[in-house]
């Protein structure tokens, strides 16, 4: 059973978690109705959808029984309900992508999926294949992807509402599988590297949600997609590569591939002169040593960094401001 609190003691995260617990616990009933009035619509709807999530796309057994939840509320809450539903269902897009194995989700298929989802949401889509990446000078993305039989892609999704006064650039790391390349990772738990594209999935889901919500802010998502493999043409430790924009870098460890693809993507995103640039990535296990597995480290311009961490906590995404020092 879910915990129950007095109304004045309940915050959004408590409601969200209680609704999620209910969605996971109530499995033997075909339908459930809950009455909220005008209270807690957003966190309850989000909790029910997110808490009831299961990745079942590849299971061989028959699907589990489902429960239908009906939220009874004031008629005036319809818009809030719809917004919460769109937001939560967009999160499920990211979850499904992260859970999809790399033999099915690789740069080409990932780009095709994003293109279809984005077009359905009314976004503009641009996909650069390996020939276009080479021609336009995306040396970081090419350096990471050249060891794989599955060539890299760069996906650009754009939301351009009329009269938008702000433009936000989103960048997300999209390494569909990371062996470490020539600097090979240990075998233990390497299977978890199917999720090394989580940053790009989050950013793709965010811009899709923005389009469906008709947000009045311009957004562009720049998503570098590559598979980091130790093939015969793979980048070697000691190689020097030229990034998009002309800056060079020396590769000392090919398992630092995220920085290479993101350098290209951030340089390209910066050409749009955004008011804000937000990048998210599964960059290093050292972050988990610092903050654990459930808290994201946020680095950047101090005021914006602190606001981003605060917003994350407000919506149930644990985040903590971290220093970004120059030495």
Spans of model-derived segments:
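Short amphipathic alpha-helical segment within the helicase RecA-like ATPase core
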Residues: 2-174
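A generic structural signal for tightly packed, nonpolar segments enriched in small/aliphatic residues
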Residues: 111-327
